[in-house]
Amino acid sequence: MRLLNTSIAFILFFTVCSCESTTPVQNPFLPKASFNVPIDLNLPLYSPLQNTGNSITLPNNLGGIKGIHITNVGFSTFRAFEVSCPNHNPSSCSSTELQGSQVNCQCEDGFSYSVFTGQLLNRQGSETLFDLTEYRVRTEGTMLYIFN
């Protein structure tokens, strides 16, 4: 019995000690935006989101820093990402533009990101680069609530 207790304590000790705690790197380019945007999918403006794979862009007066890209990724799941390119300080060129299944940064470096995952598609070298900033989406019937 004592051997069993010692073994359990030993296993617990190494399990706790072997956990790696890494803090995610905060994006230094984009400030935090606070908002809560209700979207009614029955409205004509948002009806493209009723079909899987479709995306729309909301202007920044509704939420986000420069706006919000919203995509229906299927199975009643939606993803929402910041329009500002995450690898630039907000400027006149640092918006991303929807083009099919990706969004492209308008600055000269031409970063491209997936609208389904937010991942940078043309990552090169070992430089620290950021994926799109994702916002939370809650679905209730035909309503979407996008918030941060």
Residue ranges and their predicted role:
Residues 22-100, 111-115, 131-148:
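N-terminal pre-ligand scaffold of iron-sulfur
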Residues 14-18:
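C-terminal motif of bacterial Sec signal peptides marking the signal peptidase cleavage site
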Residues 99-109, 120-133:
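Short cysteine/histidine-rich metal-coordination sites, predominantly Zn2+-binding motifs
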Residues 19-20, 107:
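Short hydrophobic/aromatic-rich motifs at helix boundaries and adjacent loops
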Residues 1-5:
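Positively charged n-region of N-terminal signal peptides that target proteins for export
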